[in-house]
Amino acid sequence: LGGYRVPNYDRTVSVIDLNTFKVIKTIDVGINLHRMELDQYGNIYVSSRGDYYDTYSETFVIDSNTDKVIEELPLLPNTEMAICRDSLYVYSTEWSYYTNSWTVSYAIYNTKTKKTDTRNFITDGTEKSIKIPYGIAINPETGEFFVTDAKDYVTPGTLYCFSRDGKKKWSVITGDIPAHIAFTDKKLKEIQ
């Protein structure tokens, strides 16, 4: 996955033998692939960032049993995603070289019904304060979800916590470019 060969973006997902770590096959998907998530039905959701010109960001679905693309979701732009049960939380930060601007969107896609449940999972207007979403995670125990904001990539970012219904519970300033979140059930020591 990745977009390191502009304009000749790679467009394949590699299937790896975990015993030998060798590529068994490649699956042709779409250009500039970025992230993958597996649902409970054996489908792999793959984000494509497009080419920032005429090919827009979208989501592809691979059936892990057949290693075939079974769905292309052009109306679901996708930079980053997280899955919890049947809900695929997706945000997109789409850059356009035509307009020299970002288009940011948020959605929840239902992996069971194959329908978009909502076009904005943040319901209290907080999304207007988030400049560049850069990470997302869902607490599997509580359903709370977290979105990070990289802001301008050179100043401290922000971590937002939202309730299941999309309302901001709290936020905290982070280091630069916050991207990843981990959950644990072990009690951690407080930083002094």
Task: Please report, for each region that a protein language model flagged, where it lies by residue.
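Predominantly soluble domains enriched in secretory-pathway, periplasmic, or organellar proteins
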Residues: 1-192
